[in-house]
Structure formats: structure tokens, C-alpha cells
């Protein structure tokens, strides 16, 4: 089935994407159909949002081989060579019962689904793939993987990013999520990155064991593994919260135990954000509402709901 927003010049389905529908049906998933594959799109999230307004069903997926206006959190550009990676959006309809407060929790659940699918694809027995609050999947390197205790900051490379956008009905206390657009950018086949990305990004192909044939890395299999994780966890978390997945999320938390630098209004430990653009502390995990727990140098434990959290000027972002 073609999307009504499809570009007329869309190319035939790439070989490693031909099995998506069959795998979705084989596993009995509620997500993945219909699947709309575009040779090029501005943004798959924009396609999904437009289709959602026109009544597209729950579980619909839009995938692009190339994006001209792909974006991540806070408007950052997501760059990807044509046909090498997974750039897709999933439309979720929570059924009118999901409060807005659940959105941060669902962003983490999506990150966990991407992390789990990536770990399966590369055979991540060492547990190097982690979820970095609030919406990235990263691969730990070197001493970070070994759990160095000499005070050195951990080192990681970004593998994937998640962007959630919502369509709301009602207002105030009655506001509910009518449609949730889950956008994912996951590096799969890319082996070299331009500019500064060369030292900050990675891909499934680069993370696999040396000598593993690249052709065995199927984007269809990885995509369906992500969809299966969402199928398993999203409905439960949307209704009841993070309790079911919290232990898994804690085990995969990239920031837990690390010294962090927090920026932004809701990360500020005073009532006057302009007076403290940044502050430092130690991350103690993620709570059941999806907020980052950071104990400041003043000893106070704070719950960070938004803003930027880094490892500091010498660490990975």
C-alpha cells in the first residue's frame, strides 16, 4: 500500500527491506502495517503527523531511504547516507487514555526497544549498548565498558536517536494524547561519518564482530525487532507507567553513577534559572516517571524532567 504522501519517483524496495511485512505478520505484531517506504522524504515524522490527522491507523510506519529535513531533539539535524540506515516513524494511538505526563516515560521505552534490537543485531554480550537519557542510544567504549574507577569520564559514540511528537485533544487537566509519532534514526550500515561525527557516532556495522559479512545485517530484521519491543511494552507503559520495564531501563542507563553537567530551566536547582545556567552533580538513575535523578554538589537530590545533561566539557555528549 502506498502512502498518499509518497513521492512519485520512489525507488523499488531495497533487498534488505523486502521482508518487513512478512516478519510483522509472522510475529503477530500490532505495529508495522501498513508500511510506507519512500525513496526520499523531508521527515518521516512530518509524513506520519499529516497522515495521523487524516485518520491513519495505529501501527502505521513510514520509512525513508533518505531525509532532507530529518531532525532530532531540540531541532538538531540527523544526517544519513541514502539507503544505509533506518529512518522511520511509527504512529501510535493510545486510545484516549494516556495522560501527557507519560510522554517522557514512553521516550525511554522507545530508546530501550531500539537498544534491545541493536544489541541483538550485534551480539552485545558485554552490554556496551546503553540508553542515554532522555532519548539516545549509545555504545560505550574502552574504560567505560570496563567500569573504570579512576575518575575518568566514560566515552561513548551515538548509535541512534529518538524523537517523540504528539497530537493532543482537550486542554488543561483533560488533555490527552490522541496520536503519538515515534521517530527513530538508527545507524545500520554506515562505516564512515563526516566531520566531527567521525569521533562521536557509530553504527551496527562498526559494532559487529570483526570480519562479520555486512550483507547479513538486515535492516528489515532490526526494524521488526524494534517494532516487537514497542508492541510488547508501549501499551502497558502508556496505561500504567514504567514499573514493568524499570529494572531493564536501570541496567541499560548510560548516565547512572556518572558526574553530569545539567543545563536548562527544569534542571536548575533554584527558582531562578537565569541565575544558574549550568550545575553539576552525580546521576543516581531514572525514576518511575522518567525523570533523571541527579544529586547536586549541595547534597540535594533533584528530579530533572527536561533540559540538557552532559558529562561535562571533556566528556561525550
Please identify what each model-predicted range represents.
Residues 289-291, 297-317:
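Structured surface patches comprising rigid loops and adjacent beta-strands/short helices at the edges
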Residues 141, 163-170:
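Short, low-complexity Ser/Thr-rich regulatory SLiMs
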Amino acid at each position: 500500500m502506498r502512502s498518499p504522501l509518497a513521492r512519485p519517483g520512489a525507488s523499488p524496495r531495497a533487498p534488505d527491506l523486502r521482508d518487513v511485512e512478512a516478519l510483522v505478520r509472522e510475529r503477530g505484531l500490532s505495529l508495522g502495517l501498513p508500511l510506507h517506504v519512500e525513496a526520499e522524504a523531508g521527515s518521516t515524522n512530518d509524513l506520519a503527523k499529516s497522515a495521523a490527522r487524516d485518520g491513519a491507523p495505529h501501527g502505521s510506519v513510514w520509512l525513508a531511504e533518505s531525509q532532507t529535513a530529518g531532525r532530532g531533539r531540540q531541532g538538531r539535524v540527523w544526517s544519513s547516507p541514502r539507503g544505509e540506515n533506518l529512518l522511520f516513524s511509527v504512529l501510535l494511538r493510545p486510545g484516549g487514555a494516556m495522560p501527557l505526563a507519560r510522554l517522557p516515560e514512553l521516550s525511554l521505552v522507545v530508546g530501550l526497544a531500539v537498544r534491545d534490537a541493536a544489541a541483538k543485531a550485534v551480539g552485545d554480550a558485554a552490554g556496551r549498548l546503553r540508553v542515554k537519557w532522555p532519548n539516545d542510544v549509545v555504545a560505550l567504549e574502552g574504560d567505560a565498558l570496563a567500569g573504570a574507577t579512576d575518575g575518568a569520564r566514560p566515552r561513548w559514540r551515538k548509535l541512534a536517536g529518538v524523537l517523540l511528537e504528539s497530537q493532543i485533544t482537550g486542554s488543561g487537566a483533560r488533555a490527552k494524547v490522541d496520536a503519538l509519532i515515534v521517530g527513530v534514526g538508527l545507524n545500520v550500515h554506515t562505516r564512515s561519518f563526516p566531520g566531527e561525527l567521525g569521533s562521536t557516532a557509530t553504527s551496527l556495522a562498526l559494532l559487529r564482530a570483526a570480519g562479520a559479512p555486512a550483507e547479513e545485517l538486515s535492516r528489515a530484521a532490526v526494524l521488526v525487532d524494534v517494532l516487537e519491543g514497542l508492541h510488547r511494552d508501549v501499551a502497558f507503559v502508556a496505561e500504567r507507567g514504567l514499573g514493568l520495564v524499570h529494572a531493564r531501563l536501570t541496567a541499560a542507563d548510560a548516565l547512572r553513577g556518572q558526574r553530569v553537567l545539567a543545563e536548562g530551566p527544569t534542571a536548575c536547582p533554584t527558582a531562578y534559572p537565569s541565575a544558574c545556567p549550568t550545575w553539576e552533580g552525580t546521576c543516581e538513575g531514572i525514576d518511575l516517571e522518567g525523570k533523571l535523578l541527579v544529586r547536586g554538589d549541595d547534597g540535594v537530590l533533584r528530579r530533572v524532567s527536561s533540559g540538557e545533561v552532559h558529562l561535562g566539557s571533556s566528556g561525550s555528549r
